[in-house]
Amino acid sequence: MKKIRMARVAIFVMFLSGLFLPGILKAQDESQERIINDSREAKAAFLKADPSMGNLFKNSHGYAIFPNVGKGAIGVGGAGGKGTVYEKGKVIGTAQMVQVTVGAQAGGQAYREIIFFENKEALDRFMDNKIEFSGQVSAIAAKAGASADANYRSGVVVFSQEKGGLMLEASLGGQKFTYKPLK
């Protein structure tokens, strides 16, 4: 009797899963597609600010674009965003960035971030979730000519572009990334 009831519950759960799973997967696909489209727009904005950045897009082994990073703080701060990862110009996955900071800081801002990977080893470290940026690593502001003088450090170079907001800070923190390959 107990086995029959368990079997009915299992069949019912599988039935419900069949009803809702396609909707969940579709929502994930739409979210992923939105991030990819936002990344394309962010790439265009970076190139508009600094046309010479085209050389980095062309010559790097890969790059990750985070089109919408939100940051806020009052003493302790945090930031986060999702992005698209490219290898040789082709989308290979998505990534999530999380940042925590501590120090004298207040406000909020939105910005874009792009990370260029000089070689396969640097991209592999990123995909293995082994790249973290500490307070000593800073992004280069994307403006005309900035990428011409940019140098890779440990196989990566980072650019950011402010989208809006005001942030006053003297803080230390770090960024951590989580990579997820496309399905």
What do these predicted regions represent?
Residues 28-183:
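Small-residue-enriched, tightly packed secondary-structure blocks
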Residues 9, 22, 71-73:
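An N-terminal domain-start capping segment
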Residues 2-13:
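Bacterial N-terminal signal peptides that target proteins for export
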Residues 13-15, 25:
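Cleavable N-terminal signal peptides
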Residues 1-2, 25:
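Generic cytosolic/nucleocytoplasmic N-terminal low-complexity/intrinsically disordered segments
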Residues 21-27:
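Sec/Tat signal peptide C-region and signal peptidase I cleavage site
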